[in-house]
């Protein structure tokens, strides 16, 4: 009887040690959400406001640039003269497909499939690089057509908005490649899939932001942009930013 009690105590002690180790590997906040995941959500929320401000400023400046063009004023090309919707649609499709491969990467590590993880992370990073290559080509094409960062207010707003998004994609690609390297060294176990999930949250956010940018920058016609831009300008004035 005493031996059975001792065995139960040992098992209970081992369970407590394992439970403590699990909490050490995955620290949780008071909300029950992993603290790293919570921090990522907070970062994405602040980044969402950042991009919202950039998009609103773009809408205002694009409307101003088009009005100056119609009045025979201003310098350099304006949106309807230079934006290539078919070409950018391909880039948008490439980035959207990278969200699918990111989901497959997470599913692979949750099944303990290290090779699948590396394959799909590599595919996601490759699609990100293709998107960045397309963005670089677009930037150089615009430059050769006379549109630069300081050419006019449209150029300034366009390159600032899309440039910051491109920087976010670049950070994401570097993150994905680092996960591949860690996986090759045996550092991403099945019970550490949260590391991949957090990277996936960031990557999906970058994709969603591009959908918004693509819709507002490339697809919405000038008269609609002017209306939205005027509303955004009025909003900035109401909160004291205009």
Can you say where each PLM-predicted feature lies in the sequence?
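...captures the hydrophobic TM-helix bundle architecture rather than a specific catalytic motif
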Residues: 1-242
């Amino acid at each position: 009887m005493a031996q059975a009690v001792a065995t139960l105590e040992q098992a209970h002690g081992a369970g407590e040690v394992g439970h403590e180790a699990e909490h050490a590997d995955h620290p949780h906040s008071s909300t029950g959400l992993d603290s790293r995941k919570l921090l990522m959500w907070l970062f994405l929320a602040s980044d969402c406001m950042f991009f919202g401000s950039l998009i609103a400023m773009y809408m205002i400046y694009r409307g101003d640039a088009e009005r100056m063009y119609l009045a025979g004023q201003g310098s350099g090309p304006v949106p309807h003269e230079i934006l290539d919707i078919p070409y950018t649609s391909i880039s948008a499709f490439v980035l959207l497909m990278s969200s699918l491969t990111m989901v497959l990467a997470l599913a692979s590590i949750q099944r303990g499939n290290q090779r699948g993880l590396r394959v799909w992370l590599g595919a996601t990073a490759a699609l990100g690089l293709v998107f960045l290559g397309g963005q670089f080509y677009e930037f150089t094409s615009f430059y050769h057509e006379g549109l630069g960062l300081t050419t006019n207010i449209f150029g300034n707003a366009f390159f600032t908005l899309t440039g910051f998004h491109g920087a976010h994609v670049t950070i994401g690609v570097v993150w994905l490649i680092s996960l591949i390297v860690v996986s090759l060294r045996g550092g991403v176990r099945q019970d550490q899939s949260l590391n991949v999930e957090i990277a996936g949250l960031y990557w999906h956010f970058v994709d969603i932001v591009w959908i918004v940018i693509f819709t507002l920058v490339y697809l919405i016609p000038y008269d609609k942009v002017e209306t939205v831009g005027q509303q955004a300008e009025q909003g900035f004035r109401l909160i004291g930013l205009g």
